[in-house]
Amino acid sequence: MVKPTGPTDVNVRKLIRQLEKTKRPIFKYIAELLSKPKRRKKHFVVNLWKIEKHSNDGDTIIVPGKVLGSGELTKDVKVVALSFSQTALEKLKDKAIYLENFVEQAKDKKLPNTKILI
């Protein structure tokens, strides 16, 4: 039988538990994605051009992985991710929000126009 694996980073484990406690379906789905083994999360890396392609003005885009800085983002969107590359942070400036901070801010708020990009 295969040994179950998951994230070894303590901070990611805490985040998964925090997401599961919120009891919101979107956060539970993100927790499920984050608890997958690393070999199955390689495609959780998203470039800015993909966010530009799949978003509209006013959207909140959640990436359960890393955002890279390839491409440009001209639309007015908030980008929430587990981590950002340095070039992505420079291009996004105040539009970038870390997932831990977003969960604390959005516990009791409605989340209209929210999309998960994988």
Curated annotation (Swiss-Prot):
InterPro entries the UniProt entry points to: Ribosomal_eL18_arc, Ribosomal_uL15/eL18, Ribosomal_uL15/eL18_sf
This protein's UniProt keywords: Ribonucleoprotein, Ribosomal protein
Cellular-component GO terms for this entry: ribonucleoprotein complex; ribosome
One record GO biological process: translation
Family affiliation: Belongs to the eukaryotic ribosomal protein eL18 family.
Alphabetized NCBIfam families for the sequence: PRK04005.1
Protein name stated in the entry: Large ribosomal subunit protein eL18
Native organism taxonomy: Archaea, Nanobdellota, Candidatus Nanoarchaeia, Nanoarchaeales, Nanoarchaeaceae
Gene from which the chain derives: rpl18e
